[in-house]
């Protein structure tokens, strides 16, 4: 069973799923805010945080199965499942494959890699030696934050990402490319619950990450609008890839408003 925190009480339950190279503590501000009113489960995915990694944690679907197993073991009623980045992919997988576990979905700065960028990711498993993983992780995380964000927190999160086992790191990054190319559109079409896309960045065709401005769309948001039957979109501006960390107050307010609309 994957490691997790279990805090608070109240319905609906909120299940938080972190990004690649991260852990459950990225959601500390959300757990602190929501746990007086909601049961909050924040997981460490396989190979991240306190959860031991296996070879099959190189596949996105394995992480979805792990979270499903945890939710079933806790006998949770249908929950609001909230993911960031890789966690968005896991969240989509859970909602599409095991719909009875999901009351709603919140995608925090998700993305779908373009065919060219997916190809780059898909080649990582073959082209990136595990001994180069730490440099790869540092280069990735250097682009994930807004310019004014706390440099000590940036350093802390970057160093944490380098602690993922190198072979798992390069293999999982490669599998994100496969998942986006082969699975995402079909899975999105299978979601039948309300979805909030809480978006702060977009990836340009050259693979660079940029902050969004109000009312700006992106290929990923366009895809969600095409495939998801019940979609709301909220933009957090001047922010990097982790709005729950950089802008927790705004993130909490957007989640709170979405929950209120569900009720």
Model region roles, listed by residue range:
Residues 32, 41-86, 97, 236, ...:
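Active-site loop/oxyanion-hole signature of alpha/beta-hydrolase fold enzymes
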Residues 92-97, 101-133:
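Flexible "cap/lid" loop of the alpha/beta hydrolase fold
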Residues 6-53:
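Conserved HGGG/HGGXW glycine-rich cap/lid loop of the alpha/beta-hydrolase fold
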Residues 26-28, 51-57, 117-118, 208:
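Conserved catalytic-core motifs of eukaryotic protein kinase domains, centered on the activation segment
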Residues 192-239:
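Conserved loop-alpha-helix segment in the C-terminal half of the alpha/beta-hydrolase fold
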Residues 116-118, 132-190:
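Conserved alpha/beta-hydrolase catalytic His-Asp/Glu region
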Residues 1-15, 35-39, 77, 152, ...:
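Alpha/beta-hydrolase fold catalytic core
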Residues 236-248, 252:
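Catalytic histidine-centered segment of alpha/beta-hydrolase-like enzymes
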